[in-house]
């Protein structure tokens, strides 16, 4: 039985390595990286806090998407990418077949995803064996942005910009219901410019100094929301797969400024500018 089990766990590892090879080939063809997320890189970009101990929990294996320090040894599906992990991987796989109870793994939670601190091979074997859940000691790290299991490394730059935007505007505190998502790399920088310009003209209109919070709240209520409401009502977003309401908000204002500069048209109220953009799109 021992020889049979040894052969089985060796075959399991070789199969997992071959799957990792196929994933790598697909990633080259599709130009979509399959690497695990690096906790340190996420921490640096998103300036996350913590960690705070949350106890032992049962965690979905597919919500574990990154690693503290072994993100080069496994791919995004937690398949082993190096033969050096063979002995440890097969040892954990053997424990699976022998129904040995292993200690909980250690995870950092950030948003809706988890990063492995200790227990990479146990996660890898669990996924390969079709296990949906795993016991883990969880420590949660605070973040101002929501992170989901579909997060990619290339998304970090925009999310980092969003963190900077929220730290400078406190929009998530002023408007807890505001959930601005962007796919445009410089989108949040442009929104900061919009708020600064809005604050300037508010000061001229009201003949007084405008606080940061007042400017942010007024911009959101009188500029951003009116455009987004028109976008939602028109259902035009479905014509732009992969784009967001905030992306279209930027396009509406780009179109507005284009008409003003190239055709000399006067600037329109936000909601009218949005309807004008949609009408142009339908022509």
Regions found by a protein language model. Give the residues of each.
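A short, basic-hydrophobic beta/loop patch
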Residues: 99-114, 121-152
């Amino acid at each position: 039985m021992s020889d049979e089990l040894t052969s089985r766990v060796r075959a399991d590892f070789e199969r997992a390595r071959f799957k990792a090879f196929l994933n790598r080939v697909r990633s080259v063809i599709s130009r979509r990286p399959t690497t695990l997320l690096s906790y340190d890189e996420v921490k640096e970009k998103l300036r996350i806090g913590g960690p705070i101990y949350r106890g032992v929990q049962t965690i979905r294996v597919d919500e574990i998407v990154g690693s503290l320090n072994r993100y080069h040894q496994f791919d995004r599906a937690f398949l082993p990418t190096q033969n050096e992990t063979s002995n440890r991987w097969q040892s954990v796989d053997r424990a699976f077949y022998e129904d040995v109870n292993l200690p909980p793994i250690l995870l950092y939670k950030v948003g809706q995803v988890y990063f492995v601190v200790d227990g990479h091979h146990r996660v890898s074997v669990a996924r390969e064996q079709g296990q949906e859940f795993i016991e883990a000691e969880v420590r949660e790290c605070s973040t101002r942005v929501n992170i989901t299991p579909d997060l990619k490394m290339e998304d970090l730059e925009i999310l980092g910009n969003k963190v900077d935007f929220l730290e400078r505007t406190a929009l998530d505190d002023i408007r807890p219901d505001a959930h601005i998502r962007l796919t445009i790399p410089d989108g949040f920088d442009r929104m900061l410019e919009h708020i600064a310009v809005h604050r300037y003209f508010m000061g001229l209109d009201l003949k007084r100094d405008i606080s940061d919070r007042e400017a942010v709240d007024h911009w959101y209520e009188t500029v951003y929301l009116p455009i987004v409401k028109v976008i939602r009502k028109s259902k035009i977003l479905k014509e732009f797969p992969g784009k967001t309401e905030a992306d279209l908000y930027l396009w509406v204002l780009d179109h507005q400024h284009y008409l003003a500069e190239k055709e000399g048209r006067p600037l329109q109220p936000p909601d009218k500018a949005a309807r004008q953009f949609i009408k142009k799109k339908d022509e």
